[in-house]
Amino acid sequence: MTSPCTLIRQFSPLEIRPLPHLDFQAGFNGIPTSAPRLVGIVQVRSKEIHQPLALVQITLELWKIESVVIPSLGISNHLSDNKCLARQVLFPLHSEHPENNIPPNDNNYSISDLSIKSPPPSLTSDWIVDSYASDQDNPSVHTHNRTTPPIPPPHLPNASGSSVYQPPYTPFRSVSTTSSSNDTSITPFGDQTPILSSSSDPYATHRVWSMDLPFEIPFPENSEIPSTFELNRSGTICSTKYELRAHMSLLGVPDITTTVPVSLSRYDNLSSWGMYNSPTNIRQVSSDGRVVVEVSIPKLCIGPSDLVSVFVSIMPNNGSKIRVQQLSLSLVEYITFIHPSSSSPIVRKKKVLRYEEDLDDMKLTSEGLSKSLSKPFPDIDFEDANITGFTTTSDLYSVQYMLVIKVQLYRARNIEITNPIIVSPVERSRSQALLNEIQTRVLDVRQSHGGVVLEENVRIVRASDFSKNNMFAYLNDDIVLLS
């Protein structure tokens, strides 16, 4: 039988985990009515059998990490931007540490449109920490039920009445006792570097063996959080990544920090949305007025394995003896960078799909000419066909796509028609299934006053719960006494 010491050493003192069988992202980013958010659990475990943890504070932060590499810019070709989008004090109360309300002098922390603001007092749960430090005889594991739904019904106004965005969520858990109450909040501020916690106040530290702290970070309705993205095209690299960082402050020792990557997706650019499947008609006359071209684009959003298709109609206007030489269809990728040393944006473009049809100087009669052009996406004729991006916009860069139709004529000016098109990372079959899931989620949010996802309990094993020198071990991530 494995000894308890061996079992304990397999655990990290601080871990961030998603809910069982789920991802960190709940709801659908880009669809505000689905109440998108990040949910999970921060687990704290003591690795010493006879020494509980002397905790001062546990915080959780959501970071966005952007990076851009532009080879042709020389020594200043690399740009990066790291931002803390949200900071939540999980333990103890946020109000017991007012210094955390002071923004640090650090450019990495910025109050941007993506920052998740602190909830109004009227929507804040009460949380009591005095019970964690009491020496009264209590059960070895304390559970605090979460009884308040995380967001109010969508039809209710913001309780704060403020013009500044306030997330419609009640933070995370509710604990009620006869003691005084304080607020738990989310703030875009945080301590950048680990510090030595040297407080001698006995009420500022809490001796515990283990804790399970559920968290829930809502996404703002009035801001766009881009998808996780990474693209390397001909040496030009742009990426957006996210990670959760948990910091545990202990008495007299450096902070312990753990990070976990988080993959975020947006669902407002699915190719199955009806707004992207209405035909778009474009009419253009050649610069000499001799030919009229009409183009019909059946769908304005494409995904992997989709067929990019257009219908082209060419009619003579006031010319004769006009011949059509070639029709072509192209999809061009535009990567736009915002560089501090450049007065204008830097644009890199590359064709990612091309289809040509030679008509061998076909005569344009009075009845005109109609053709259909189509090709699967991505185009396997390109060497980097396996490198596919999608439409996205971030702080340092944006990736957009343009559909280009060219008509090459003889005895008339050539015509070129361009129209923006959205490229989605999701296949159309999967997109349709996601629409059904989104609809179900939105109905759940409306009917359950927020579609509660986080139903976990706060679980705390305090040092005072072991009156004797009992040994303990972990079983299925729960601490248990050994007989």
From Swiss-Prot:
Keywords: Cytoplasm
GO cellular component, one term: cytosol
InterPro entries, A to Z: Arrestin-like_C, Arrestin_C-like, Cytokinesis_Signaling_Reg
Positions with biased composition (Low complexity): 171-187
UniProt KW Disulfide bond keyword: no
GO molecular function: calcium ion binding; protein-membrane adaptor activity
Biological role: Involved in cytokinesis.
UniProt record similarity statement: Belongs to the arrestin family.
PANTHER family: ARRESTIN FAMILY PROTEIN 1, RHO1 GEF LOCALIZING PROTEIN 1
Listed name of the protein: Arrestin family protein 1
Source organism of the structure: Schizosaccharomyces pombe (strain 972 / ATCC 24843)
Taxonomic placement: Eukaryota, Fungi, Dikarya, Ascomycota, Taphrinomycotina
